[in-house]
Amino acid sequence: MYLIEILKSIFFGIVEGITEWLPISSTGHLILAEEFIQYQNQNEAFMSMFNVVIQLGAILAVMVIYFNKLNPFKPTKDKQEVRKTWRLWLKVLIATLPLLGVFKFDDWFDTHFHNMVSVALMLIIYGVAFIYLEKRNKARAIEPSVTELDKLPYTTAFYIGLFQVLALLPGTSRSGATIVGGLLNGTSRSVVTEFTFYLGIPVMFGASALKIFKFVKAGELLSFGQLFLLLVAMGVAFAVSMVAIRFLTSYVKKHDFTLFGKYRIVLGSVLLLYSFVRLFV
């Protein structure tokens, strides 16, 4: 029986690893997955913490892939490269500031929007936004004003960070929200995609620390079995993220986000239909 639980962890890790970086909402897909696949004898407190902390596996992949670029202490970097790295971290910090003011409301958002209908609506809304922005930019022949991450202005970093706040709504997608913000502000797909990867580092570590704190504060303790299931899911999320990040980085160099927009609309519509049918079954 415990083997089945491990297989579930592997499945959740695969879902997290793919959907955390593709702009299709990891939280939304995990909510959907839990509708049909659930751990046995695990309470709501554990699952709430699990759905957030599993993201640490995904963010570790970013730190591994971009370690050289993110590490200001690399011996082979000259002074100019070191300053460039610190400027990148400053931009990440600036973009994270808007979230600090709303983190305390995460429980409220979970209580009121952690459901399939809300997820479906957010999937559709941002799917439409992706398609609209891509069509608008093509119709107007709008060329991105920021094509290199080094030249991303601090004000633009903050502007993109404002869109991260919208990701508190399940189904939005943190990467999806920041990509929309970047496209609206004239940032190229490649730059906003890479910057989105980096933004996940403080956000996911902060969100995980907050969830663990609340979990412990509520008097909950992780059993060995729960810890093992969580670590398995994180490990799988890390491995799958290594592939997903490289895929998306390559994909956006030649394609736009229209395909992801269409996927979101189709999935959101299916979830709305499912929610409607479930009312009468």
UniProtKB/Swiss-Prot annotation:
Under Enzyme Commission nomenclature, its number is 3.6.1.27
For this protein, the record's InterPro entries field holds: UppP
Show the disulfide pairing: none
Any one GO MF annotation of this record: undecaprenyl-diphosphatase activity
Q: Among the record's GO biological process terms, what is one?
A: response to antibiotic
The domain of life is Bacteria
GO CC field: plasma membrane
According to UniProt, the reaction catalysed is:
di-trans,octa-cis-undecaprenyl diphosphate + H2O = di-trans,octa-cis-undecaprenyl phosphate + phosphate + H(+)
> Which keywords are on file for this protein?
Antibiotic resistance, Cell membrane, Cell shape, Cell wall biogenesis/degradation, Hydrolase, Membrane, Peptidoglycan synthesis, Transmembrane, Transmembrane helix
Kindly list the places in or outside the cell where this protein is found, as annotated in its UniProt entry.
Answer: Cell membrane
Keyword Hydrolase in annotation: yes
- Coiled-coil-forming residues are none
Q: Transmembrane segments in this chain: where?
A: 4-24, 45-65, 89-109, 113-133, 152-172, 190-210, 225-245, 257-277
Q: How the protein sits in the membrane?
A: Multi-pass membrane protein
Q: What else is known?
A: Bacitracin is thought to be involved in the inhibition of peptidoglycan synthesis by sequestering undecaprenyl diphosphate, thereby reducing the pool of lipid carrier available.
Q: Which PANTHER family match?
A: UNDECAPRENYL-DIPHOSPHATASE
Q: Report the protein's function.
A: Catalyzes the dephosphorylation of undecaprenyl diphosphate (UPP). Confers resistance to bacitracin.
UniProt lists the family membership as follows: Belongs to the UppP family.
- Protein's recorded name: Undecaprenyl-diphosphatase
What is the species listed in this Swiss-Prot or TrEMBL entry? Streptococcus pneumoniae (strain ATCC BAA-255 / R6)
Taxonomic placement: Bacteria, Bacillati, Bacillota, Bacilli, Lactobacillales
